[in-house]
């Protein structure tokens, strides 16, 4: 599959559905999460890989590269 992976810092529990950061590497996402945690967002965030890559969209389960 082509395209750059996207790593996200997302909220959990009451903040589920909120994306706080989108990063090009897992390490950068972890750094973003650390900064967020230092600013009051402890224990409510997770780092995860996006189901899409950069410049992709999904329609009815089909991935389309832009």
Segment roles from a protein language model:
Residues 1-19:
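Short aromatic-glycine-(Arg/Gly/Cys) micro-motifs in beta-strand/loop hairpins
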Residues 8-10, 22, 49-50, 54:
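Functionally constrained cores in energy, signaling, and assembly domains
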Residues 13-15, 23-45:
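A short, charged, amphipathic alpha-helix used as a generic interaction element across diverse proteins
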Residues 35-66:
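Short, mixed-charge low-complexity intrinsically disordered segments
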């Amino acid at each position: 599959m082509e395209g750059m992976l996207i790593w996200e810092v997302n909220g959990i529990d009451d903040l589920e559905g909120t994306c706080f950061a989108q990063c090009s590497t897992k390490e950068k996402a972890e750094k973003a999460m650390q900064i967020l945690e230092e600013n009051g967002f402890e224990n409510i965030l997770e780092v995860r890989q996006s189901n899409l890559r950069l410049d992709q969209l999904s329609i009815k389960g089909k991935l389309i590269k832009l």
